[in-house]
């Protein structure tokens, strides 16, 4: 990278997001970095959840009926897939293909050559978060139209594409 800002743009439990500039073509990008050691922490937490679920299923009929162990296994599969930035890159690329030629949604480019299991690099897009209502109102943004388009995007993903990608920002 030509330039890398060490102050995160955003931080969540699994990853942090930074801004940078590519060395090759000077494009502004965002870099999503999986937190070091988070996989081991998650695996430890899942192990504890599994032990609690197994215990509860032996002691309580409702826990057995709710299939808590199965629920933990499903959660494990989902959360571990969220740790792989290559899978997220692939999902973003698929979403971009699904919305090609559609002006409802702009999906940023992913720079696959820079991506790895713990790193996602994608085009920097400037925008205003939808929760900044005062700013959007000041700019005259039609919030009803934004909501309608959000629903349309969701419905297209679910019922037309049969592919839903919810993490639309790094």
How would you describe each model-predicted region?
Residues 1-170:
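Conserved catalytic cores of large enzyme domains
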């Amino acid at each position: 990278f030509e330039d890398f800002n060490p102050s995160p743009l955003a931080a969540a439990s699994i990853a942090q997001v930074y801004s940078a500039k590519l060395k090759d073509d000077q494009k502004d990008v965002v870099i999503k970095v999986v937190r070091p050691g988070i996989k081991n922490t998650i695996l430890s937490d899942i192990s504890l959840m599994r032990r609690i679920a197994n215990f509860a299923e032996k002691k309580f009929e409702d826990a057995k009926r709710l299939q808590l162990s199965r629920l933990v296994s499903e959660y494990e599969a989902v959360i571990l897939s969220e740790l792989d930035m290559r899978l997220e890159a692939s999902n973003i690329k698929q979403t971009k293909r699904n919305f090609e030629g559609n002006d409802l949604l702009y999906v940023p480019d992913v720079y696959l050559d820079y991506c790895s299991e713990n790193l996602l690099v994608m085009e920097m897009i400037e925008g205003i978060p939808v929760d900044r209502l005062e700013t959007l109102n000041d700019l005259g943004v039609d919030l009803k139209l934004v909501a309608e388009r959000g629903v349309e995007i969701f419905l297209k993903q679910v019922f037309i594409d049969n592919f839903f990608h919810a993490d639309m920002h790094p």
